[in-house]
Amino acid sequence: MNQKVILHLDMDAFFASCEQANDKTLKNKPVVVARNNDKSIIIAASYDARKYGIKAGTPIFEAKQLAYGELIIKEGNRDLYEEYSERIFNLIKEQFTYKVEVLGIDECFIDATNIWEKYGNVQNLCLAIQAAVYQETGLTCSIGASFTRLFSKMGSDMKKPNGITIITKENFKTLIWNKSIKDVIGVGSSSLEKMELLNVKTVNDFVKLDEKIIAESFGLSGQKMYQKLHGIKNDEIAYWETSVKSISKEKTFDKKNMAIEDIEEILFNLAEKVVLRMQKNNILAKTVTLSIKFYNQEINFDKKQHKKRRTYSETFGEYTDSIEKLYSRVKVILDDIYDGESISLIGIGVTNLIEKDKLVKQQSFENIII
């Protein structure tokens, strides 16, 4: 049986980084996400803000003093963060593996047991994931790789931002056991109080305790933590084993008033990427969708249409993976709806999918019936 290879992907300063990726004028500036109220607490801080000593939990009034005259406060945009999150997790499922357990808006576990060898080694796989996420979103992520969930999750926090930490059966005692017991995920405040009484300050102090003392002092949870810190068990990833239901690519624009020819060229490039992904997955599509978002915020968008964007779909008479058919159809849609407004995002997607092999079998069966 192959040893598990579990990755934990954690986006770097996610909320603040989304704001910077969405507005290029914020690049390399101290950006924080919080209510613009001196009594408010910062929810997220960009790495540029952290250079001033600002971090999540810092009061706004203090942050303004630390980055006097430089601090940029964004009040938060949940739709934006969810949009980036969805793009990231869909990308991983479509390009790498469907064995993804989403933990929150900015982190997930990935079971890479059966895919890492394609990349030569685990390091190369992690680099490929980081590159794909950055190319898709302009955001960086840190990845921990190990044979258990706990070690991979702790690893993703060791070399931020944009870092990779691989924890093996050979090095986990060096990388994990030397850390403060406070850094271990799952150790609560009540357990920490008991550990102080036992003079436990590091993971090494804890694992050296007699197992009987651990059972008496911390009960079943302490025994489980003891096992986890020895790399025992804790290696299952909860994922939904579903086939691909849609494939899409989109592009946000940094500048307004782009020429229609440039927009059409970008749309064609997006269509090419969608078709390449379809062909990689041996998939045909029957429905194509154009997604479009405008800079003019006064437009009365239908919020149900995927986060303030307009979508237009058309269905073909037969399944296809033809770049010519897909692009020509969305170009006709674009020509019909475009009236010169500045576009902030454009995308193309396909749904109503079928595997080529299944379609061939289906057509063969229909021919027999006929």
Regions found by a protein language model. Name each.
Residues 1-185, 189-370:
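Basic, low-complexity intrinsically disordered segments
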